[in-house]
């Protein structure tokens, strides 16, 4: 099972509505990078090592707010993300609040619940820091409980989801680690997925007690996701063309999201989940070729 990589090309809906990406911007253009070369050929062009105390750097990140996607249980709020002891700490909490968007009789999952029962945080890289090609590293520690859905992922800056392209550098749910790519299908708001996963039984019993390094290596013709230096999934960018608009969503700049979702379509039941629960990020680094 450890060596088995399953490629699934299927059409599915990820969000309850299409997600519109940020407007076109001037971004880091990192150039095609030869990932077979020594790391000394790389230069650091953007990073956050979270070596401050308190709120994350507002020049680098913005926050999602409210109920956002996938019928997840958490209400996103910036208060659940802090920098402490050299880490970004995203905390999932069980706490009850009034839902300010509640509408009596609503059939929309975001507005038909009168209370918020769980909170968490989702950080989004500010648009001026979006990057294209090169290498991104995220060192993080996740808790592998049922109900938790931590993620490291990117979205393209142009177009609505999924035609803007999605890269799930890391997701955890269903007792497995996932690495996925998504492009647009011929049907609006539906994705074609290239997915890979490894069950937690593939890893050492103490795996979740340590930090791990997730890497996205990105050239003009290939993207590859690695976990602790081992390939999890890759995609040929000469063929990753949207069925919807004929564009290649991985030949444009992408921006990063770091979030801890709770429950929802993939996270599972929260009945036995321990709260508060923390997702720790040691650093994010983006490199270009020298």
Tell me what each language-model feature is.
Residues 1-27:
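Bacterial Sec-dependent N-terminal signal peptides
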Residues 20-290:
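GH16 jelly-roll
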């Amino acid at each position: 099972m450890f060596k088995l990589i399953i490629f699934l090309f299927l059409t599915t809906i990820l969000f309850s509505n299409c997600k519109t990406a940020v407007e076109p911007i001037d971004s880091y253009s990192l150039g095609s990078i030869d990932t077979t070369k020594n790391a000394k050929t790389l230069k650091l062009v953007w990073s956050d090592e979270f070596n401050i105390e308190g709120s994350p750097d507002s020049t680098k990140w913005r926050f999602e707010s409210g109920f956002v996607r996938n019928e997840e249980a958490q209400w996103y709020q910036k208060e659940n993300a802090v920098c402490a002891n050299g880490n970004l700490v995203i905390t999932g909490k069980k706490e009850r609040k009034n839902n300010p968007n509640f509408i009596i009789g609503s059939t929309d999952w975001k507005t038909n619940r009168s209370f918020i029962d769980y909170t968490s945080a989702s950080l989004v890289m500010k648009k001026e820091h979006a990057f294209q090609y090169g290498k991104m590293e995220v060192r993080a520690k996740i808790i592998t409980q049922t109900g938790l859905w931590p993620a490291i992922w990117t979205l393209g800056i142009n177009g609505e989801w999924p035609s803007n392209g999605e890269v799930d550098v890391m997701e955890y749910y269903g007792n497995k680690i996932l690495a996925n790519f998504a492009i647009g299908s011929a049907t609006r708001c539906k994705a074609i997925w290239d997915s890979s996963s490894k069950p937690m039984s593939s890893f050492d019993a103490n795996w979740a007690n340590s930090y791990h390094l997730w890497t996205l290596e990105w050239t003009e013709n290939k993207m590859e996701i690695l976990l602790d230096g081992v390939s999890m999934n890759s995609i040929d960018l000469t063929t990753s063309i949207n069925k919807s608009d004929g564009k290649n969503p991985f030949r444009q700049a992408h921006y990063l999201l770091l979030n801890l979702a709770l429950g929802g379509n993939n996270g599972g039941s929260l009945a036995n989940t321990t709260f508060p629960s923390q997702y720790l990020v040691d650093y994010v680094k983006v490199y270009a070729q020298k």
